[in-house]
Amino acid sequence: MTLNGLMHAERSIYLEGLDDNKGNGYRKAFAVGMGKQIELRIPRDRLGLFQPMVLALIRDQKQQLEDLSFELYGNGLTTSQIGCIMEKIYGTHYSKSSISNITSTFYEQMTQWRERPLDPHYLAVYIDAIHLKIRRESVGYEAFYVIMGVKDDYTREVMAIINIPSESASGWKEVLEGIKQRGVQSIGVLISDNLTGLDRVIPLVFKNTKHQKCVVHLKRNILNKVASKHKAQVAEDLLQVFNMDLQEDTVEIAYQRFISFSNRWKKQYRHIGALANNEMNELYFTYINYHHKIRRMIYTTNWIERLNKEFRRTFKIRNSMPSFESALTLLSKVAMDKEDGYMNYPIYNFKFDKKLNEKM
């Protein structure tokens, strides 16, 4: 075969003039190259120093195959789909198990990324969930929580992606302690939905961190239970309660507007009336304590929504994921790609509020 002949000739040239080294037979090996499986007879030398250039070329092709597999998997293709594409490109059929073996390195890389050290301080941290179909004993939706942070240089990064089957205070304590163990010492403000138990454990792990509950989620939950004939008016009232144009607003004044709103609608809607009875709802107004130029950036978790759209686009071509590990791996790949893109651009409005820069 031509490749074997090339390697034999290459060894002959290599050994010319080397009195202390000679040929030492061949070893068999198999590789994929030029669209098919190749049986190679690799020449050896007695000192074990000879390395044919042909092998380097084949290794380059193998690396290209792995890189392409990673990229296709990261874009949501299944191992079967990747195998079909590889067969068209390289002319050799790759089974699901073969592709899984190739992508095992990809799994390891994503795990290392999720466990990487984090910065000591983050100006703001956002937590939001995306729900994906996961196959365990049966197929069902599970929540994956994305934690995104604004760094001291005003750029963003995904700090963690975590699968929590059910919310609880102990679960959130474990999550926050996890990012603390990876190096986080302080957080300016943490923005989240009304997640069960989170408000209780934040001060236990990051004692000086302020908590802002997502106003957009609150509005959505309120309006979902309002009759169509009242929706426009309730939405307008909520717009006045959470008025972003009032630069001199205070938490106390805004919260009183919230109580008045609750009392106004309590006869028609019990769920709105109940809002006035929960003092923890004051956490929806934490954003007012900060400079008016960043209030729109910290009163909602919508900053993660752009990333969630990328997640949904990637998972759209998958009916369900075979395991939560595979879902975590795919989410990690998408997040890493976005960190190299728009998340690298600084959000300079955060420089207007020095309170968020305080290392606590």
Report residues per predicted region:
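Short, conserved DNA-binding cores of transcription-related domains
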Residues: 1-56, 345
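Electropositive nucleic-acid engagement tracts
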Residues: 2, 18, 27, 77-124
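RNase H-like nuclease fold core
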Residues: 41-46, 53-58, 64, 92, ...
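Short, amphipathic alpha-helical "recognition" segments used to contact nucleic acids or chromatin
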Residues: 64-76
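Conserved beta-strand -> loop -> alpha-helix junction used to position metal-binding or nucleic-acid-contacting
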Residues: 189-196, 201-239
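Acidic/histidine-rich catalytic cores and adjacent linkers
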Residues: 241-360
